[in-house]
Amino acid sequence: MATLFHLIDVHGNEYQNVQDHSLQMALEELNQQIEVIQRQEEQLALRKKAIEDARQEVLQQIQHRKFRQYLHEREQEARLQEYYLEQLQERRAFENVVRTIIRKRFEDEERERAHRREKAARKLLRRILVSDSPNMQLVVPNNFQQMFIHHPVVDTIYSPEESSESQAEVADQQTGPYSTSEYAGAQQSQPFRIFIQNDNAPEQQSGPDVAELNTLPNRSKTSSQASVSDEELSRTELAELNDYLLAAQRRSNKRGNARKHIDLTARESPSTSFAQMSKGALNPDPEVIEPEDEPTTFRNPLEALLSTGQYSVVSSDEDVESVRDPDDGTLPIHSTQTVEEPIDTKAGEKLTDSSKQPSPPVAEHFSNETFSASPKGAETDVKSEGSNNHEQGSFNEPKSNVDSNDSASPKRPSSQASLRHNVTVEEVPDEDA
């Protein structure tokens, strides 16, 4: 029966039974659905591609915009840096100009200050010195070189081989009140001496500005021997030492007066005018030392005492005890208050005694001996016309007390103001001649 019935579909496919035909129809439907799905996938792929292209374009636009903004910021930063660099260069150029002007002004002020300091030092040292000699030596205290002993120039000046010769010379030169046991320590080391430049010469003259040092002190040098020799310092060494001295003075003068802070010597400071002058040389301040009213020329102390009108010089053979004048501690002169004697005996001695000349002028340095160097062993006797007032008594001190109290001058009694003293210089003609 199978051969009698043939199943033929629309397309001409021949089937043997119905199940085969139904399966074939289901397969065709599935194929159609697959085709529809494939077409949808193609459409979705196209849409996806379009979306991706749009997205990439938008991202590229965003990147371009950011890059343009970055470039703009970099250009602005570069312009700001150029502007700031120009401003900094202008400011530095202005600062350099101002700094150059200020430096030149400071150099000018320092030069003027150094010039004024040199002029003040020269003026002060001219005022301190007694004589106008070009080789005048100013003797400062003994350990003055300890302030700048570490300077290399000082080591060459104060060498050990020169110390023995300098000590022998200093021992010969030490005379007068400085030869006592109080100043025996001055011969232990070489004193520091400063040679003052002659101010009468023009300023263009070669030589140090403020002072020059001499290694071997010798008071008997002439002006021809005071010239610069090979043993003395050179110009550069003098300038270096001058700067070092100014720096030492500036360091010592930081907290005020240098005399209050520097202990120059271990011994007690003497009260003489020469030692005070030496102290004043350590602090050359023009405001400290007032200008002198009297001229600086040296006067004979005997003439100075006679010009006061309180003493009179007469000739006598009688030994009168000497009393040191309280105004001048270095000159041993006889006091006006002598031991009481009758007036007629004094007149008799004046008539019988031969004329004696007064003592010769005293040298610059006095010795501690009594003033008894007149010819024929005569002594200068100072009389007082008020000796007849017995109620006022005698104010003469013993000679032992005067010698013991040599450093401190005795006080004058209060009742001396009531005495009147007149100058009576009497010269009796020489009868023997």
Swiss-Prot record:
Phosphoprotein among keywords: yes
Cellular-component GO terms for this entry: cytosol
Chain positions found as Phosphoserine: S227, S229, S269, S409, S415, S418
Composition bias, Polar residues: 172-184, 215-228, 385-421
Protein origin, superkingdom: Eukaryota
Basic and acidic residues composition bias: residue spans: 343-353
Record key words, sorted: Phosphoprotein
Protein name: Protein slt1
Gene that specifies this protein: slt1
